[in-house]
Structures are given as structure tokens and as C-alpha cells.
């Protein structure tokens, strides 16, 4: 039987330790998403919906799956964001039973505000990080996101 990555005890222990540390270090040193959400006057879950929709129109079920939020909890988020004029809902041309959710121009502007808030936070990172370290962080993030897709 072929060996799977979970059979590698050292790898599993290392990843467990790294993910454990990331739980508290990522928000402290890199991205304080709660501060961003508060500054924009929306809950974190609504902010995350907007971030997911940046990739294009998707169904409520796909939003639920990507954010690991139960479908019944996604619907009120979508309704609230629709009421704010940030997103819209429309029936799929391919499957009339499916409702697609997408960004409105105001939602696209809000996504840019989120990106700007992230840039602002990056500007407040300690100046003693050097260019080489920041390139390593960026490459590690890119590799992690590539694997996650």
C-alpha cells in the first residue's frame, strides 16, 4: 500500500506545531481581520463573503463550502450585503434553480477598501523585518494558497 503524507509522524508533528503557533501569531504579527472588519462596520463573516466573491459570481452553496459556514447562516449574510448594495443575487442562466451571488460596484469598492486596510496593516509591521524575510513570508503564503486551491 502506498504511503500517504499522514503516515509521516515527523511531518504531522511539525505541521501541528506550526498551525498551533499560527493560531495566535498570524493575528498578532500579520493580519488583524477583526480590526479591518470593525473599521468597515461589518462582521468578519460579511467581510469574508466579499473576499470570496472577488473571484467571481458563485452560489450560496459555494460560499458556504469555501468559508465553512452552514448554508442557513450564509443566507442572512447575503441578504444583509444585498440590502447594503454591496452584492446582488440572480438566477443562473444554466440552472434556474441556482442563485448566483456577485459583487456590485459598491461591493468592488469595499473589496478595495479591505485590500487597502490590509496594506495599511502591513505598513505597521515591525521595521526590523528585512526584505529577505518578507519575501520568504510572501512565498510561503503563495505556496500555502496554491496547495489550498
Where are these regions (language model features)?
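N-terminal leader segment of winged-helix/HTH proteins
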Residues: 1-40, 132
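Secondary-structure edge/capping motif, primarily at the C-terminal ends of alpha-helices
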Residues: 4-5, 60, 148
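C-terminal ligand-sensing/allosteric alpha-helical core of TetR-family HTH transcriptional regulators
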Residues: 15-33, 106, 117, 121, ...
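N-terminal helix-turn-helix DNA-binding core of bacterial DNA-binding proteins
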Residues: 31-73
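Charged, amphipathic alpha-helical coiled-coil/dimerization segments
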Residues: 79-142
Amino acid at each position: 500500500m502506498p504511503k500517504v503524507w499522514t503516515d509521516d509522524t515527523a511531518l504531522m508533528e511539525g505541521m501541528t506545531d506550526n498551525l498551533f503557533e499560527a493560531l495566535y501569531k498570524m493575528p498578532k504579527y500579520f493580519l488583524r481581520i477583526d480590526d479591518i472588519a470593525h473599521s468597515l462596520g461589518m462582521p468578519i463573516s460579511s467581510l469574508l463573503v466579499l473576499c470570496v466573491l472577488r473571484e467571481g459570481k458563485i452560489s450560496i452553496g459555494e460560499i458556504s463550502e469555501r468559508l465553512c459556514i452552514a448554508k442557513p447562516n450564509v443566507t442572512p449574510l447575503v441578504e444583509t450585503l444585498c440590502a447594503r448594495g454591496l452584492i446582488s443575487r440572480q438566477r443562473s442562466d444554466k440552472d434556474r434553480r441556482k442563485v448566483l451571488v456577485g459583487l456590485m460596484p459598491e461591493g468592488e469598492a469595499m473589496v478595495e477598501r479591505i485590500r487597502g486596510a490590509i496594506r495599511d496593516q502591513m505598513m505597521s509591521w515591525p521595521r526590523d523585518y528585512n526584505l529577505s524575510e518578507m519575501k520568504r513570508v510572501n512565498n510561503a503564503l503563495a505556496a500555502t494558497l496554491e496547495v489550498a486551491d
